[in-house]
Amino acid sequence: MHLDHQKILEKYKSYNITVDEAKIKKAVEFAIKYHGIQQRASGVPYYSHPLEVAEIIAEMRLDTDSIITAILHDTIEDTDLTLEEIEENFGKDVAKLVDGVTKLTKIKFHEDNVRQAENFRKLLIALSDDIRVLLIKLADRLHNMRTIDFISNPEKKKKIALETLELYAPLAERIGMQQ
């Protein structure tokens, strides 16, 4: 069993005694399989990112489907795994959540829209008919900010930081996620 997988399970078991370990392990195996040899800017295997996001979600005490969604959140966007395959293997709820996170990721915030950030935040909330989608996206952004120093392109780093400051930080505060 993968070390990060164990940390996620331990956190989850601390508040939920009915853990579907097999389903979580299967999601980890999918992340490892589908992200394959992809790497983060830091050089670590890409699948480490969704596992870190899942650990944040476990710290937030969300349900099994949310943890599995965090583990699979980048697979539709970055691999050849399909929503249909996610639904077949993990159920309709997980597929819907992964789809929601993917849709939020596709919405691009532009620096020149700083004054419209409030409208953009409202759009993100409106597009998330399930609060778990927003929480997973915020956990994703939190982990990306924790590892931003590995991005070598200063413009890309600045864009991510500005987007976080103008969009995601106020959104996190609004829904009570000050971390």
State what each model feature region is.
Residues 1-179:
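Active-site helical microenvironments for divalent-metal-assisted chemistry
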